[in-house]
Amino acid sequence: MHSLSLRRLLTSVLSLCSCSSALPNQRRSNVTSHVETYYSVDGATHAEKSKALKADGYRIVSLSSYGSPDSANYAAIWVQEEGPSFEIIHDADEATYNSWLQTWKSRGYVSTQVSATGPAENAVFAGVMENINVANWFQSCELENPWAFSNTTGNVDVVVKGFRMFGTPEERRYCILGHENVGNEQTTIQYSTPSFTVNFASTFEAETTKRFWRPSRLFLSEDHIITPSFADTSVGKWSHAVDLTKAELKEKIETERAKGLYPIDIQGGGSGSSERFTVVFAERTSPKPRQWNVRGEITGFEDNKAAEEEVDSIMRRFMEKNGVRQAQFAVALEGKTIAERSYTWAEDDRAIVEPDDIFLLASVSKMFLHASIDWLVSHDMLNFSTPVYDLLGYKPADSRANDINVQHLLDHSAGYDRSMSGDPSFMFREIAQSLPTKGAKAATLRDVIEYVVAKPLDFTPGDYSAYSNYCPMLLSYVVTNITGVPYLDFLEKNILDGLNVRLYETAASKHTEDRIVQESKNTGQDPVHPQSAKLVPGPHGGDGAVKEECAGTFAMAASASSLAKFIGSHAVWGTGGRVSSNRDGSLSGARAYVESRGTIDWALTLNTREYISETEFDELRWYSLPDFLSAFPIAG
């Protein structure tokens, strides 16, 4: 890239030096921290203000450079708080900036803010580096595709801390900064590329429909394309604004300050009459800390106190490392709980989990379907050998499907292999659009069945087993068809024996007051409104499922205590009475595990499956908790 003039080069370096000072190495999280902002200022003014604010004990928390590289403008937010020493640079060409970056990196400093403006061959850079403890961090400012950033991190999971799309519409460049994701923080960032531009309005709506999610940064390009970043941390009340002029931004800051909200991110783009800003406001300038809480009792072990300390320690290590906010663990003996603990690792605006709170169960829901079939067989209302489609009056396109019986469906050997033909339980939108109504209404379970029977099987029934969500869905339809009672009503009357087990409804609006938040960062197209392009959270249809139609396979909710009690008299896997085995459940926003082990039955529920890795969860369910149960004898 071309070098800047000597005058600008000296200005950037002198400004860098004037902003250097050492502060204590411990930040404070203060709701009422004094906040200073400026925007639409040139480099000299930015340097002057930086020097004065540093002298008064302020730290920079948001930095944006924009406009022409020959006369870049700056927007910044400073907060008066203690913290580690830091360095600042601005108006630096690529060579100067990279040299500065490497110099301070070699001294243990970490990049925390980065911005750039101008065409790829003549861009100028600005940034902040702090003397903080981040084991691994990565920054690349020559990316031609933002998705290529993941190739630079060496498989280290990172949180994007800084971003700028610069260059020209014909020759984009992306500057991305990421810090190693310690604690499994959940964030998203939605990139635009020359071939795809994010619809900000619909993306913003989808992301903030996820409970407790908020915008953290609204990065802005010179041509006013917003790259939004979202987080699930808590900063109290918040608001945002986009496409603001300088005068509108000033007015907005004053209006929000009167409400007790302060700017925590300002991004600028354009120059002259095209200068525009995005801004995020919040009650707090830094996220709330998480707190550890435990509820419930352990009553049935020889040493209840020691057992309590051990299992609480196991769960705390797992939850803090993996960022899991809500969980339960329960143990039962002959249908009576001898331990029920609920765990919360969350901010103070989330509910503290109680032992009787209910969690989405994912595929653990299938054991209620198996118990229903067992009830029908034991009451001579159904046989395991009954051909299912003939019973329901269907004529499948594939004649082999006429041989599918109840046992095939229970054993996942009916001829459906989701690795070959897809999983209908997550295809409600596609199925609805294939109907004569062309997606004018959501698909029902009956629509799914009729869609499937018109397709060829993936293998001959009985040849082998392939895990299927469709098989239990079909069996739940059989239950309703035989009894004349809706499946959920049948469960309540004949299977649950008073246990609090219920349907987890699809719509996010049904869960705004839930104590348990089924957490997922993912969104997807809405299957309840198949003609809409609207995005919805993963647990609320974004995974493609309409849960009201999937009750037999993965849509039920209950507490860990209810699960442990239930498997004391019902097969946790298979069909019939209690048997030593286990069942696993995984779904967007949910993870559950139940096991009958020797004489005891135990259950684990989590409000997310987005922990660090499956290895972490496997260690918990297959080793840590079973080892605990082996090490602490049951009383009596």
Swiss-Prot record:
Glycans are attached at N30, N151, N383, N481. It comes from the Eukaryota. It catalyses: a glycyl-glycyl-[protein] + H2O = N-terminal glycyl-[protein] + [protein]-C-terminal glycine. It is an enzyme of class 3 (hydrolase). GO terms for biological process: effector-mediated suppression of host defense response. Residues 512-540 are annotated as: Disordered. It is found in: Secreted. Pfam families: Beta-lactamase, BTRD1. PROSITE patterns: PROKAR_LIPOPROTEIN. Disulfide bonds join C141-C175. The keyword Disulfide bond applies. GO terms for cellular component: extracellular region. Its main location: secreted. Belongs to the peptidase S12 family. Serine-type endopeptidase that cleaves Gly-Gly bonds in the polyglycine linker of host plant class IV chitinases to disrupt their chitin-binding, and thereby plays a role in lowering the defense responses of the host to the fungus. Degrades Z.mays Endochitinase A (CHIA) in vitro, although corn is not its host species. PANTHER family: BETA-LACTAMASE-RELATED DOMAIN-CONTAINING PROTEIN (PTHR46825:SF9), D-ALANYL-D-ALANINE-CARBOXYPEPTIDASE/ENDOPEPTIDASE AMPH (PTHR46825). This is Polyglycine hydrolase. It comes from Fusarium vanettenii (strain ATCC MYA-4622 / CBS 123669 / FGSC 9596 / NRRL 45880 / 77-13-4) (Fusarium solani subsp. pisi).
